[in-house]
C-alpha cells in the first residue's frame, strides 16, 4: 500500500520517461484484458449462482447482524464491598463490607485535633494500627486501605496520616490535606466516589480529614454507582500478589537469537542443561514501570543501570579517544612535512602543494578529486611518469558516472510501477486459462428456454415461484 501511495504521488514525474510510459500501458492493458477474460470465463457468475441457488431473487443485507445487550446486577456485588454515602458537604460515611453494623465517618474540617508524635504516624500499609483494640480491626483496616487506594495514595501523593487514642476521646485518624495538591486530589477522588459536594480547597488554611468509627443507623442512603466507582478505582490494586525467589533458575538478558545483548528485552532461562528464550515487548516494560513487584522488573532495572553505566563509560572513553586522535593527527601533519623534506633531499618525487591534477569528463562535465602533481629536481613530472595513476583515476571516474546514471534511471522508475506491471501481466496470463475453461454459470431445464435470471436449485425449483415442478431434468449451461 505504501508503494502504491508513493507511486501515485510521483505520476507527474514518471511520465517523462519512455520506459515508464511503456510499463504503465502494459499494466493497464493487462488488467483490463484480465478482468474481461475472468468475466467471460463465467467464474464470477458461477460463484454468485452457488451462493444464491434456490433462494429468493432479492438480496438480504445484514442477515446475521443482531443488536444485543447485557445487564449487570450490582446487587450481587455491593453487599460484599464497602458502601460509601454522603450526609452533607463535609460529612461522609463508609459502611463496612458484608453489610456491617459499623461505618467509618469521614469529616472534612479546618480543625486540627491530633499532633505529630513518633508513635502515631501511619501510612496506608499499616493504617489498621489506628483501629487497634477494635472488634473488627481487620475489616476496618481493609476498608481504609480500599479508600486510600481509591485516592491513589502513592509516593507522589503522601498526605500525613496521624493515629489517635480513642480511649482519650480522640478520633481514630487524621489526614492532613492542607497542601493544595493533596486537597485537590482528595476532593476530585472523593467527588467521584461520593458524588458532587462543595470544594473545601477554596478556603485557604488548614484542612484535615478526621476519621472515626460510628454505628450504622442508615444515616444516609447508599448508591450502587458510588460502590462501583470505589471498586473500579481499586480494580488493579487489590489483586493478590505473591513473590517467590526461584533460585533454581538463572536468567540472562539476550536478543531473540539467544546471543547475549545487554539492554534487550529477551530473557534466556537456564534450568540445569536446557534453556528457554522469552521475549518481552513494550507492554511488559510499561507494566514494570507501573508495578515493580517482580524479579523480572528488578532484573530489567539492574540491566538498565548497567547499560547506563556502560554508556557513560563509552562516552568518557570516546572523549579520551578523540583527544588521542587529535594529538596523533597533529603528529601525522608534522611528520608529513618532514617526509616531504626528506624526499626532496633524497631526490624522490614529492608534493609541493602548488599544482594538482584531475581527470575531467567533458561530456558530462564531471571531474575527479584533484591530486597533487609531484615534483622532482625542482620541476614537475611529465604526464608519462604517472600515466598509470591518471588512467586508473579515469576508470574510477567512468565507473562513478555509470553508477550515478544507473541510480538516477532506477530512481525515475518506481518499484511500485514495476510491481504493478509484473502482477498485472501475471493476472492477465492466468485469466487466459480461466477464459479457455468456460466454467458453467447456471442450471438449465432440458428442453426449455434459459431460465435466467431465475436460480434453480438441484431439484429444479426456484424460490421466485416461476418453476414449481420438482425433479425435472437439468443440465449445466455456460454464460450466454
From Swiss-Prot:
Residues glycosylated per entry: 88, 126, 176, 352, 360, 377, 382
Protein residues bound to Zn(2+) 2: 442, 444, 450
Site, Cleavage: residue positions: 58-59, 246-247
Keyword tags: Disulfide bond, Fusion of virus membrane with host endosomal membrane, Fusion of virus membrane with host membrane, Glycoprotein, Host cell membrane, Host endoplasmic reticulum, Host Golgi apparatus, Host membrane, Host-virus interaction, Lipoprotein, Membrane, Metal-binding, Myristate, Transmembrane, Transmembrane helix, Viral attachment to host cell, Viral envelope protein, Viral penetration into host cytoplasm, Virion, Virus endocytosis by host, Virus entry into host cell, Zinc
Pfam families: Arena_glycoprot
Positions annotated to bind Zn(2+) 1: 57, 454, 462, 464
Topology, Cytoplasmic side: 34-58, 441-480
Site (Important for GP-C-mediated membrane fusion): 33
Annotated InterPro entries: Arena_glycoprot, Arena_glycoprot_zinc-bd
Lipidation sites (N-myristoyl glycine): 2
Extracellular side: 2-17, 59-419
Transmembrane segments: 18-33, 420-440
GO cellular component: host cell endoplasmic reticulum membrane; host cell Golgi membrane; host cell plasma membrane; membrane; viral envelope; virion membrane
GO biological processes: fusion of virus membrane with host endosome membrane; receptor-mediated endocytosis of virus by host cell; virion attachment to host cell
GO molecular function: metal ion binding
Gene3D superfamilies: 6.10.140.1590, Arenavirus glycoprotein, zinc binding domain
Disulphide bond pairs: 85-220, 130-163, 183-201, 266-279, 288-297, 351-372
Similarity comment text for this entry: Belongs to the arenaviridae GPC protein family.
Record protein name field: Pre-glycoprotein polyprotein GP complex
UniProt source species: Whitewater Arroyo mammarenavirus (isolate Rat/United States/AV 9310135/1995)
